[in-house]
Curated annotation (Swiss-Prot):
Solcar repeats lie at residues 15-102, 111-195, 202-302. This is Mitoferrin. GO terms for cellular component: mitochondrial inner membrane; mitochondrial membrane. GO terms for biological process: iron import into the mitochondrion. The chain crosses the membrane at residues 17-36, 77-96, 112-132, 170-189, 204-223, 277-296. InterPro entries: Mitochondrial_sb/sol_carrier, Mt_carrier_dom_sf. Keywords: Ion transport, Iron, Iron transport, Membrane, Mitochondrion, Mitochondrion inner membrane, Repeat, Transmembrane, Transmembrane helix, Transport. Belongs to the mitochondrial carrier (TC 2.A.29) family. It holds the Pfam family Mito_carr. It is a multi-pass membrane protein. GO terms for molecular function: ferrous iron transmembrane transporter activity.
């Protein structure tokens, strides 16, 4: 029985779309929600209107937010990202598995590294189209002095004041960041899987380690574009006044694209501005991607085993 389960787990990429959808949706929710407080810290550090208190580390920043604003504040926007990440990751993992199977002939090995990267790029195009609106709402909820009572109110206000285009203003930047991120991420994961788990059986330890290493490297390399994306998503806060939150809502955006945001970041912070939030981003991504791959592979294994057992 155990051998049959492993065999079906190995053959999953060729035929089991429902399993990939279910496992991917759950993995997405875990990835984005478990380490969400550090994502909130990263957003504030990268915004051009960070909180007044300068903190030496992301952990100190998180403690400062909790002390000044309450322990629930770092979780603002988590429901938006959960709602967006489940369908986005369901499609993301499914497209990746199908593209990988198509490009490699369902075989594994270091010679397929570019195929893994290409599969990740295609999956990212689909993922970001679904995820970008949730990302906009999430980051505006994360900002200090954010006036929105809920993610739904935030989405409604953004739509009424700025139109539907506001939800995709950072889409090209998101792709410019996530295409290399996911290419590095997937190539790194498959590389470490080949090193740690050459038989490609279900092995929780190898999935955890490979996911964490791949996610950490990809996060560090793509931090500059993440800074640009955050500025585009949160630019309303550029004119926020703690004593009058209505100014936040009435502020008009100033950066119409990547080039405007890049120039503004450089003029205000220099080259160091493109590495803001690097530590917080890596702290978020290493456990997040490790857990995401672990949950995905676990549920893929469990669902395939259940299917084999019932038949």
């Amino acid at each position: 029985m155990g051998g049959g389960g492993e065999d079906e787990y190995e053959s999953l990429p060729t035929h089991s779309i429902p399993v990939h959808l279910a496992a991917g949706a759950l993995a997405g929710a875990v990835e984005h929600c478990v380490m969400f407080p550090f994502d909130s810290v990263k957003t504030r550090m990268q915004s051009l209107c960070p909180c007044e208190t300068k903190c030496p580390t992301p952990v100190h920043s998180l403690m400062s937010i909790v002390k000044r604003e309450g322990w629930l504040r770092p979780l603002r926007g988590v429901n938006a990202v959960a709602a967006g990440s489940m369908p986005a990751h369901a499609l993301y993992f499914t497209v990746y598995e199908k593209m990988k199977s198509f490009l490699t002939g369902n075989t594994a090995g270091h010679e397929h590294t570019l195929a893994y990267g290409a599969s990740g790029v295609v999956a990212t195009l689909i993922h970001d189209a679904v995820m970008n609106p949730a990302e906009v709402v999430k980051q505006r909820m994360q900002m200090a002095y954010s006036p929105y009572g809920s993610s739904l109110e935030c989405a409604r206000c953004v739509y009424n004041r700025e139109g539907f285009a506001a939800f995709y203003r950072s889409y090209t930047t998101q792709l410019a960041m996530n295409v290399p991120f996911q290419a590095i991420h997937f190539m790194g994961y498959e590389f470490w899987q080949q090193v740690l788990n050459p038989e490609h059986k279900y092995d929780p330890k190898s999935h955890l380690i490979a996911g964490g290493l791949a996610g950490g490297l990809a996060a560090a390399v793509t931090t500059p574009m993440d800074c640009v994306k955050t500025v585009l998503n949160t630019q309303q806060a550029a004119e926020a006044d703690p004593s009058n939150r209505r100014i936040f809502l009435k502020a008009r955006y100033r950066y119409r694209g990547i080039s405007d945001a890049v120039r503004t970041i450089y003029s205000q912070r220099g080259m160091a501005g493109f590495s803001c939030g690097l530590q917080a981003r890596v702290i978020f991504q290493v456990p997040a991607t490790a857990l995401s791959w672990s949950v995905y592979e676990l549920f893929k294994f469990m669902l395939s085993f259940e299917g084999g057992h019932s038949s």
